[in-house]
Amino acid sequence: MNTTATLHPITKLKSQIEANLQWGESSVWNNYDFEKLSEQIVEKTSVSLSVSTLKRIFGKVSYKSEPSMTTLNALSQFLDYEDWRDFLVKNPVNTETPLP
């Protein structure tokens, strides 16, 4: 039986955004929350991410493609990383995380 799981880097990014905002888990966010997040991202990074894009990232809307590099860079910069690459370097994926 496999008792390890890989925590996807985008999952880490989302968790850090949730912790930074202190609005609770994104699974309970509503449209207003995504609008406020979009506004905060523009204010901090000068990059406009639509509410629809944010909902896709946070799993509120079904979408099979990976986010664009522009989106990942903006979300990383929102958390005070230089860009997505800097986020990845400073948040290595732990492939040996035990499952509960």
Explain the meaning of each model-derived region.
Residues 1-38:
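A short, Lys/Arg-rich alpha-helix, primarily the initiator
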Residues 33-35, 68-71:
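DNA-recognition element of transcription regulators
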Residues 20-29, 40-67:
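Recognition helix of helix-turn-helix/homeodomain-like DNA-binding domains
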Residues 69-84:
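DNA major-groove recognition helix of helix-turn-helix/homeodomain DNA-binding modules
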Residues 55, 59, 72, 93-94:
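Residue-level signal for alpha-helical context at structural boundaries
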Residues 1-2, 80-100:
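Defense-system signaling and execution modules centered on TIR/cGAS-STING-like, death/scaffold domains
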